Amino acid sequence: MDEFHRYGKEDNSRQQCFLYPLFFQEDLYAISHDHYLDGSSSSEPTEHLSSNDQFSFLTVKRLIGQIRQQNHSIVLFVNCAPNPLADCKKSSYSESVLEGLTLVLEVPFSIRSKYSVEGMNEWKSFRSIHSIFPFLEDKFPHSNYISDARIPYSIHPEILVRTFRRLIRDAPSLHPLRSVLYEYRNSPENLQRSIIVVPRVNTRFFLFLWNYYVYECESILFSLLKRSSHSRSLSHRPFPQRTHFHRKIKHIIIFSRRNSLKSIWLLKDPKINYVRYGERSIIAIKGTHLLLKKCRYYLLLFRQCYFHLWSEPYRVCSHQLSKNCSSSPGYFLRVRMNPLFVRTKMLDELFIADLITNEFDPIVPIVPILGLLAREKFCDVSGRPISKLSWTNLTDDDILNRFDQIWRNLFHYYSGSFGRDGLYRIKYILSLSCAKTLACKHKSTIRVVRKELGPELFQKSFSKEREFDSLPFSSKAAARSQRERIWHSDIPQINPLVNSWQKIQDLKIENLFDQ
């Protein structure tokens, strides 16, 4: 692999001509077999394969031949196997073939990413959920329109193969990819004409497909931002100091006020900001409504022409931030106009100036969270707490820890929003549901449970001190935390309740357009 990378660096065209012979290199499948054994979440392959069984590369080559012949008797996906215990050894070979296919397809993309790192990076994408909140705090108050777009994840397999052909000209290396995609499309779990490309499938092959697909979708926005820049030069590379560049131009043409204003206006780029998390992306625009319509039209039209699929209009929702709210990622997002009165006194005269500032205002979706708690059997549809019957077979500590974890996740995730009073209603529902669950387990009442177990158990799980354990222990700090917004850094992944709520919102929008 390193030798192939070295040849690709010397001659970039060679990366598109020598991919297919890599499928028959035994070292490649040894690496993929080790990746499969190390990254497998299930221990069934290692349990049912004895130590005397050796990995045969001849069997792997025969499987490759069966893939090329479109022989659907083999199962390339473990989840589609009718009897995974009987076909365990076959599944290990199939996963090794998929790993080998992924390793081969990753070669040209790794070379291209290496070149982009060595040169000047023109496209910087956020790679962590912790980058979303500073982006919202910094960019949203200076934007007046927002476009909430969902990446289309249902795509025909032939379109994916054609997108790979734009980079890889080695046609034989794409035949196994085409066969695998068509077999997955014809599998019993996916009986439709298109395949679903989502990041939730925890296999290297589908993660690679998703990353490549998202890269192609985001390249559309990159070209839009590149074309909208009026001050591009130096081979379309960005200026390291754009602020000083504008100041120099303004200083040079200051003698002509009319021309200078026009020139400076042309040099100012339209503020188009982009952020993505998972399958949803947000485009914040500072400009007119016509610019928003053009951006939305460009996005839909380019997706239709580039991927040869019909982009559903409801997947790109555009509205004004000061009047409407957006529901991503798990918040109701809006920009609130905050009037600020400033009084200045000069000598004996008093001047009053009214300033209006924009403030980012994320809102906690209390009603959707109550609906999700009702679905999870923590309360009824009216918000009245009920016992969690499925947890009555657990120990008291496990029950308290589970309720405590749910409340802590909710509070930490929504700690950066204004109006957190509704969260304490959620806290009351969870605490009372916890008490009813313990009472149902011990076949007694809530009063008896409190008397026997003691109130310190509930204070341990639902005390206010745990909410501010990262702050200085003072009353002023606790009072200030009620007014200020704190984005906690211990949310490496989005709350499962937020994901469920987002799915419900998507289904409501899709059903509205289907009627």
UniProtKB/Swiss-Prot annotation:
Q: Which Pfam families match?
A: Intron_maturas2, MatK_N
A GO cellular component entry from the record: chloroplast
Q: Which GO terms describe its biological process?
A: mRNA processing; RNA splicing; tRNA processing
- Keyword annotations of the record: Chloroplast, mRNA processing, Plastid, RNA-binding, tRNA processing
The UniProt GO MF terms for this protein read:
RNA binding
The record's subcellular location field reads:
Plastid, Chloroplast
Predominant location: plastid
Q: Does the keyword Metal-binding apply?
A: no
Spell out the HAMAP family in the cross-references.
Answer: MatK (MF_01390)
Provide the family line. Belongs to the intron maturase 2 family. MatK subfamily.
Function of this protein? Answer: Usually encoded in the trnK tRNA gene intron. Probably assists in splicing its own and other chloroplast group II introns.
Designated name of the protein: Maturase K
Q: What is the lineage of its organism?
A: Eukaryota, Viridiplantae, Streptophyta, Embryophyta, Tracheophyta
